[in-house]
A protein has these predicted regions:
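Beta/alpha (TIM)-barrel catalytic core signal, keyed to glycine-rich beta->alpha loops juxtaposed to Asp/Glu
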Residues: 1-149, 154, 158
């Protein structure tokens, strides 16, 4: 016979929680875990795109400058009014509990029963430090409730 599927790979972040509504229950039932990628929502959850900023050498900054339909559509999916507003709120939650939004987003991603591990990416050592700081973090019920409140108020920031 063929090997059984063990995991699937989907985009999953504080700004893209569709997996919870669309596939999580089936994955639990079938014993298939999620290997999420883009836990920082393409870097948006770091706050680097807040207030209309387009940092040099950032992927979506290049996409906006190229102004080509495919790249522009992707950039607008990740960076829009809803995603930057939710990011600001998540950053405030992170600050309240003494961590960066990068650490918060990574910790949140790995704290789901259907997640096997989380695919992360970094271009600089200090980015990796913030990501790896989430390894031993377990977010409190209060923090998770605050996160869920933002997600209810700003439903599906990435569409």
């Amino acid at each position: 016979g063929t090997a059984r599927y063990q995991t699937i790979q989907n985009n999953f972040s504080l700004n893209n929680r569709r997996f919870e509504d669309e596939l999580a229950q089936t994955c639990r039932k079938e014993g298939v875990s999620l290997l999420p990628y883009s836990p920082l929502g393409g870097g948006v959850l770091s706050g680097k795109y807040n207030d209309g900023q387009l940092p040099d050498n950032a992927r979506f900054s290049r996409y906006f400058k190229l102004n080509e339909k495919r790249q522009l559509t992707m950039a607008q999916r990740f960076i829009n009014e809803k995603s930057t507003e939710s990011t600001k709120r998540f950053m405030a939650i992170a600050a309240d509990i003494g961590m960066t939004s990068v650490t918060l987003a990574t910790a949140w991603s790995k704290q789901h029963d259907f997640v096997a591990s989380t695919i992360v990416g970094a271009t600089r050592p200090e980015q990796l430090d913030e990501i790896l700081a989430a390894a031993d973090v377990t977010l409190s019920a209060e923090t998770l409730n605050r996160i869920n409140e933002v997600s209810r108020e700003i439903l599906y920031p990435m569409g």
